[in-house]
């Protein structure tokens, strides 16, 4: 695909929408001057967070360095000046939404979520109230349901369908609402009220769905306020006064609600979604009449005009903003928003909307047109039935046989290609279930299988558990979009051109009768990794146990938040070296950041403090912890607080978790220490040589002759085999090493951890060798290199069995 001709075709179709031709700066100038830090990165997660510009941040820092700001609750000169700037910021926000200051107030919060929480906490719920919300809402909106239900109110979701049947003067005839079942709680202490007082109900919907990009008709505000009885068929849930909440967190950057035309009662958003900075700051735009109904209990500094400490008395401030903003607001962040609005106002939101949606339409059309060589379509896009779409495209992809590509595979390969995107359900469970066709039974089944947010279980029971999302911001370009489309086509469309690249090389098993002529294999290296994700040590011989190599991954480091630390997040762990002396019965640990070498007794140690139980990836472990001296040593070694834990269960653990599922583990039923999938990883020297040859060739093409070369230890194998053909190990169903029998569990799925270079003197992250492996070692969503093994111990009790370097490896033999 030629970029010049492709762009020419794009401009013929979208030229009047794309590029800000009538602005002081066009898109190419904006990218060249304001976003140089992107370099070759393609950033496509603007729905998650858009980017700040260089001139914006220069203005922010210049302002902070030249202006004296004080606490706006003080009465000093600088504080009064700060208060004035905060007031101007409120007006700027209201103007952005075309909201009259006579009708609306701007309450600053820590973000859209905090604004939603404030509405839920203070809304005048009663047992006669209803909370109605569209299915396609963010979790932060769904959380309001807890406040409603706890006060005895009813809660229910609705599907909103845009029918567009014929011409109509009224928008009501084009919108159809389908009600889901009513949710209620019968909790003690909930006051059951009659119909004597006013009943207030709340309806919440997003201006744009963050999952699909579907834009919702703002006429919903008037429809609900004036026609709730018709829509809800005069049920008891339609009675009372309806207030409307718009979650504009996703939509505000390109098409903010116009509050002069559509009178919503509450609008929430975050500033980093608008222009990247500041984070931790959002706002609740509230209609003044609605604010009078809000029942706030807590008061704080700045929210009262008077309070008496030893008497039940306080007097609230009259201003809406003053009473609802607890404590000192983030005034330095608030002063920064004026600099963010500059580029938005220069371009105008209408131009930003046209620019971003033209790019999204291009991507949408290209993805829909992709076909495999057998004629099957590649992409399934979500939200296409909507009349209007925002600058977001969410989709999944299928192989020629109709099975799904996992979204984690897409994300992994995109990262290697320099493309930043988002995968999963995007904290929008209703939209996720709706578009993916997941029933309640499907969702519960996935949960039973151990699936949680942010995990790697992207395909369960033959269905995707989430999707791939790309979203565009005001600084996105056609070139970004085309690079992404090319990435999808080259990595996921099966054609005669790229079929070989998308299938792993496999080796046929030796033909009977000529096995004697096959190359002989020998064990050339044994490596033990006592502490998970830290450096290991090589030995000539080592004892085998029912859990694998003796003491292999018997220890782990845990963060103060309970997270198990690995090189994926703490690459500095590769510099922690380990050594076990079996004769001395000690584990020795060293780090360049620690002067003293740490020594830990293997059998009994004064450093041990207590035993405990903990769950890791749904498996229960008995662990031993160590005293503060040990934890301080490791915390210094990785420059973050952590604790050292040892697996103290003599039986170790089975791979089956408490849900009856193996999770990511493949060594089902085996006894394991803190390994991810299996007891052993075996790598072939010939496979490493072949990979390095490919890396050298790719380096010449991509980097002008500079090539990355990797050693076998980059892959953290326990066992290294010599001789034979590259990837011969792929065909081994079992191996015999010096009379010890091992069962193959298949290939090892590689992750970005192999891109960390531990030999450079400092931690360096590359795209290689994983990017090259992805080009020829992909199989069913995984990038395979090396094989996983399980030791088949013939005896029921632990025996004195050793494995030794130099022993012959005999593949695919009979077990004796």
UniProtKB/Swiss-Prot annotation:
Keywords of the record: Molybdenum cofactor biosynthesis, Pyridoxal phosphate, Transferase
Function: Sulfurates the molybdenum cofactor. Sulfation of molybdenum is essential for xanthine dehydrogenase (XDH) and aldehyde oxidase (ADO) enzymes in which molybdenum cofactor is liganded by 1 oxygen and 1 sulfur atom in active form.
Tissue specificity: Ubiquitously expressed.
GO BP term, pick one: Mo-molybdopterin cofactor biosynthetic process
PROSITE patterns according to UniProt: MOSC
InterPro entries linked: Aminotrans_V_dom (IPR000192), MoCF_Sase_C (IPR005302), MoCo_sulfurase (IPR028886), MOCOS_middle (IPR005303), PyrdxlP-dep_Trfase (IPR015424), PyrdxlP-dep_Trfase_major (IPR015421)
Lyase listed as a keyword: no
Gene: FLACCA
Enzyme class, UniProt record, top EC level: transferase
A Pfam short name: MOSC_N
Source organism phylogeny: Eukaryota, Viridiplantae, Streptophyta, Embryophyta, Tracheophyta
Active site residues per record: 427
Pathway where this protein functions: Cofactor biosynthesis; molybdopterin biosynthesis
Residue numbers bearing the N6-(pyridoxal phosphate)lysine modification: 273
GO molecular function: lyase activity; molybdenum cofactor sulfurtransferase activity; molybdenum ion binding; pyridoxal phosphate binding
Domain MOSC: 647-812
Protein name (Swiss-Prot/TrEMBL): Molybdenum cofactor sulfurase
Catalytic activity: Mo-molybdopterin + L-cysteine + AH2 = thio-Mo-molybdopterin + L-alanine + A + H2O
Cofactor requirement: pyridoxal 5'-phosphate
